[in-house]
Amino acid sequence: MIRKLSITLGRVLRPNDFLGRWRMGDEFIVVLPSTTIEQAVSVAERLRSSVESASKEWLYPTSVSIGIAHYPRHGNNAAALLEAAEYALIVSKQGGKNRVTVAP
């Protein structure tokens, strides 16, 4: 399942974007260099939609919740950006999952 998910996510991203597993579970991190917050939201929506669509053919339908943090608006170092993205992710999950949320 994780492999199918990573392939689906990777198809949406540009060659210079970064996709990697995050933490111990089923979380991923995506870094979108030289991207505006509006572009990041658009990419996140495409990621969410792609997984929703592709997973209809998988054994277990899957959805993704996405939290977005943008440099320098949400922080000027990795720790601050990760904290802001994590907060936005929690808001997405609490809002019913299968959502994209930008950090406040």
Put a short name on every predicted segment.
Residues 1-11, 20-25, 29-30, 37-45, ...:
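Conserved long alpha-helical elements within nucleotide-processing catalytic cores of c-di-GMP signaling
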Residues 30, 62-64:
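HATPase_c (GHKL) ATP-binding subdomain of two-component histidine kinases
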Residues 19, 50, 58, 65-95, ...:
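Cyclic nucleotide signaling catalytic output domains
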Residues 24, 29, 71, 99-100:
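Short, electropositive, low-hydrophobicity segments enriched in small/polar residues
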Residues 8-23, 55-59, 95-96:
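Nucleotide second-messenger and two-component phosphorelay signaling modules
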